[in-house]
Amino acid sequence: MKICPFEITPIPWIDNGFYYDGEKISPAKHPYYFAGLYYLQEPSAMTPANRLPVEPGDRVLDVCAAPGGKATELGAKLQNEGVLVANDISSSRARGLLKNLEVFGIGNMLVMSEEPGRLERYFSGYFDKILIDAPCSGEGMFRKDKKMVRAWEEHGPEFFSKLQRSIITQAARMLKPGGMMLYSTCTFDPLENEGTIEYLLGEYPEFEIQEIAGYEGFAPGRPEVTKSKDPDFAKTVRIFPHHMKGEGHYLALLKKSEDAICPSSPVAEQKAKKIPAELEEFFRDVKWDLKPWRLDIHGERVYYMPENLPELKGARFLRSGLLLGELKKKRFEPSQALAMNLKMEEYAHTLNLSSDDDRL
């Protein structure tokens, strides 16, 4: 905040979110944006990642992660501990997701492009926390984006509810006992919101709806639109644009019982690698405890992998771990991803430039 060059005001229900006037300033053109100091996102869309209680060291899955606004927040919460699996079924969208995560210095990550059903093969009962920002009919975005109205006419709530039910049940099987899952949409239709959650609870009664940290503008979910009329649906949250300064959204936080019985993917063994001399020489200037068993070398490229991963042979990756750099002609060439991941105090040789320096 001390170095912020813009006039901003806090978003009252997001502890690290702020409004800005897009007619007066262009934050996406400022050097701080390219340095990964902030991400530009619609205010209501910040809420799902903010309300999923991720802790450092968690294993976290973002099922439908592109373009990366929620994934960057989840990665920041992990503080380079644990693992973030950021997935998007579209490989082209996943490339943008990877770019955003690397700009923000997220290193303990896997960026994948798989259908949730295939993810389940690798990550059964594996994750502590899962975020599902589900594809939806987009009714909550009609005010902001008129193209969403035409898209709704082509594929409405009935189409998306089938897709959502498939995604949420597959995700449920990837959550470990005691884990938490947050489901969100940017639509108003009960079929896609309370209806999807009711379907999950019918298929997997070991899940319970949890309270979401409140805000005076949040509206409760609607038990009356469900078959069960279960009052717990009032613990889910609806965000309406006429109540808050943000677009329409729905959120439901769920917990899997500690006693739930489900298969669990075993952790694969990570064998220690010999650290190449060129890499070892470079890291003499880096204040890291470089762990040899986390190194993964493919040709010239050197990756630093998260720990305690399952066997992932055959999975579709865009990135596995942090790309440290490349071994070229008996020297190590560090990557931009590594530069974004390192804190200034972690490297011996730095140059501190002001945002208005001509070299930027």
Residue ranges, per PLM feature:
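Conserved SAM-binding loop of SAM-dependent methyltransferases across substrates and taxa
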Residues: 67-80
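Polybasic, low-complexity RNA-engagement segments
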Residues: 1-5, 247-250, 257-360
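Conserved AdoMet
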Residues: 2-46
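Mobile active-site "lid"/loop adjacent to the S-adenosyl-L-methionine
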Residues: 92, 128-169, 186-193, 207, ...
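S-adenosyl-L-methionine
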Residues: 87-125
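Helix-to-beta-strand junctions that scaffold the AdoMet/dcAdoMet cofactor pocket
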Residues: 78-79, 175-177
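A short acidic, Gly/Pro-enriched loop at the edge of an enzyme's catalytic core
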Residues: 55-56, 120-131
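Conserved class I S-adenosyl-L-methionine
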Residues: 57-66
